[in-house]
């Protein structure tokens, strides 16, 4: 099955240090899965291959103001985000992992929840690339 590179994008969601790297708060909860399924290695290969084919690679981080005033309702995963001090703008933890940075063409702005589209510029990025 073929595809048109200009009509295709790979959206890399939440590949951030707070999730993906040892020593950061959320890593212990996902460490086994990341290792067992080689998530980082596979994501890098996907992004690298996409770039080689001319496909747009979009980074879609979740970030919050340092005081979490933009967090919204604090329940479920969002309560743990604040409790753990994670995904705060301007911190190393909120940054995309170094392994993917060379392949990301553009980053989504405004993601505050699980949906990559709600309140962000993702739709615009994908429609008008």
For the regions a protein language model found, what residue spans apply to each?
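Active-site acidic carboxylates
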Residues: 1-103, 107
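Alpha-helical scaffold elements lining the catalytic groove of polysaccharide deacetylases
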Residues: 108-129
């Amino acid at each position: 099955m073929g595809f048109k590179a200009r009509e295709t994008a790979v959206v890399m969601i939440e590949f951030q240090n707070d999730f993906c790297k040892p020593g950061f708060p959320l890593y212990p909860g996902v460490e086994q899965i990341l290792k067992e399924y080689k998530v980082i290695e596979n994501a890098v290969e996907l992004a690298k291959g996409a770039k080689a084919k001319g496909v747009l690679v979009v980074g879609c981080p979740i970030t919050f103001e340092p005081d979490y005033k933009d967090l919204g309702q604090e329940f479920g995963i969002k309560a743990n985000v604040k409790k753990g001090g994670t995904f705060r703008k301007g911190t190393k933890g909120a940054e995309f992992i170094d392994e993917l940075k060379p392949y990301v063409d553009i980053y989504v702005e405004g993601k505050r929840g699980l949906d990559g589209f709600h309140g962000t510029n993702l739709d615009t990025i994908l429609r008008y690339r």
